A protein has these predicted regions:
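Short, solvent-exposed loop/turn segments at secondary-structure junctions
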Residues: 40-43, 87, 119-122, 178-183, ...
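Membrane-interface soluble catalytic domains
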Residues: 22-25, 121, 235-241, 283-396
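A short beta-strand-to-alpha-helix junction
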Residues: 93-100, 213-226, 269-275, 286-302, ...
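Histidine-centered active-site microenvironments of extracellular/periplasmic hydrolases
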Residues: 238-285
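A long, amphipathic alpha-helix that forms part
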Residues: 155-163, 199-246
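Generic structural signal for small/hydrophobic residues in well-ordered secondary structure
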Residues: 39, 81, 106, 176, ...
Length: 396
């Protein structure tokens, strides 16, 4: 798979960031960071019916309603939000065991760390990438039982960590990856809000197309369970007055498709359902606002570093921008999978894919309808030219 990228993108000689970029001067007021990521979390799940607690929480924060993951799978979806790099950098970052600038900067600022997952840190290899510079005791995996059972236990552990640290002057960075919404979409009886769900869900015997509405009902119920676990976190943040000194990031790794464009699941196409995810950000002192401009996972490092008062030039370490900057605007976004990158403009998606020795390029409208780029009237050429010039900026 690594070789496939070499057909269309440069690899090797990674020049990610100069250690001299690290800011050693301490900001006057250090903020905690709570970073919550949910597996397979579609952007359209935050409704009063499905996720009432998160709907209420989002309406009091910065809610980016047109947000895109940096990938259609977990690996690229998490990689892009911590590094601010396109997915084809994954292989070199993994080979070089390079932690992201964001984590290195927090280490330089003497943060306390806790990273919890209801999946595993070893696959994808986040223990060798995102969290590679953290001591093993800061990483907690619990993956016994169904996803909802893991999330219940891990949410309790996350809350215990927060409560233990909230009285200390030393700031903390806490991360949790939730697994409730992952297929087969398991949930306890108390989270059934759609009763017409498929009970005997066997990949080998189920008629996927015929049963898709009932399969999606399982997903809806599982997402409702996710909401109840998140509500436990919102409650402790309020009760401990942590909203005044804690940055909160709430997002998904990628979306989930239910045959809207002929596929089920994720990591197969760049359909809106597979790449659109929630993005809710709380910055202490910032007024609530719903934002409809396009935003991306690659913006997160620049956004959080600036919110911490470190004010680093984003172009020196990522492809992203500070989402709260007055001039924030993307002419195009990039979303990645194993096989290549997709350039997304407001009107079209241009997919560059390499599978084996076969190089493929295709295009669709923003709503995933096939098109001939030769007939396209919008100015996608400018965005495409800029992407081709910029994509290898962090390789020597």
């Amino acid at each position: 798979l690594e070789d496939e990228f070499s057909y269309s993108t440069k690899t090797g000689n990674l020049n990610y960031f100069d250690p001299g970029l690290l800011v050693t001067k301490n900001p006057e007021h250090k903020l905690n960071i709570l970073w919550l990521v949910a597996e397979s979390w579609r952007a359209d799940m935050i409704t009063p019916e499905i996720m009432p607690n998160t709907f209420a929480f989002a309406n009091e924060q910065q809610w980016f309603e047109n947000h895109y993951s940096g990938g259609n799978g977990t690996r690229m979806g998490l990689f892009t939000q911590f590094y601010g790099l396109y997915g084809h950098y994954w292989f070199d970052v993994l080979r070089n065991r390079r932690a992201p600038l964001l984590i290195e900067q927090l280490r330089a600022q003497d943060y306390q760390f806790k990273a919890i997952t209801s999946s595993a840190f070893t696959y994808p290899e986040f223990d060798k990438t995102i969290f590679s510079s953290l001591e093993p005791e800061y990483l907690q995996e619990f993956n016994e039982g169904h996803g909802w059972e893991r999330d219940q236990k891990n949410t309790g552990d996350l809350i215990s960590f927060i409560e233990d640290k909230e009285r200390e002057e030393q700031p903390f960075f806490a991360f949790m990856f939730f697994e409730s919404a992952h297929a087969n979409y398991y949930f306890p009886d108390e989270d059934i809000i759609e009763s017409h769900y498929i009970e005997d869900f066997n990949y080998l015997t189920v008629d996927i197309e015929e049963s898709m509405p009932q399969i999606k009902s399982r997903y809806t119920n599982a997402t409702h369970h996710l909401d109840r676990q998140l509500a436990r976190v919102y409650k402790v943040l309020e009760e401990k007055n942590l909203m005044d000194n804690t940055i909160v990031v709430l997002t998904g790794d990628h979306g989930e498709e239910f045959m809207e464009n002929g596929r089920w699941g994720h990591n197969s196409t760049f359909s809106q359902q597979q790449i659109r995810v929630p993005m809710i950000v709380h910055i202490p002192g910032m007024e609530k606002k719903k934002r409809t401009d396009s935003s991306s996972h690659i913006d997160m490092p620049a956004t959080i570093l600036n919110a911490l008062g470190l004010n680093m030039q984003a172009g020196q370490h990522s492809f992203g921008q500070d989402m709260f900057a007055p001039d924030y605007k993307h002419d195009y976004l990039v979303v990645s999978d194993w096989h290549g990158n997709t350039v997304i403009t407001p009107e079209v998606k241009i997919i560059f894919s390499v599978k084996g020795a076969a190089y493929q390029a295709s295009s669709t409208t923003i709503d995933d309808q096939p098109i001939n780029l030769g007939d396209e009237k919008s100015d996608y050429q400018t965005a495409l030219s800029e992407y081709l010039l910029e994509q290898n900026r962090f390789f020597n």
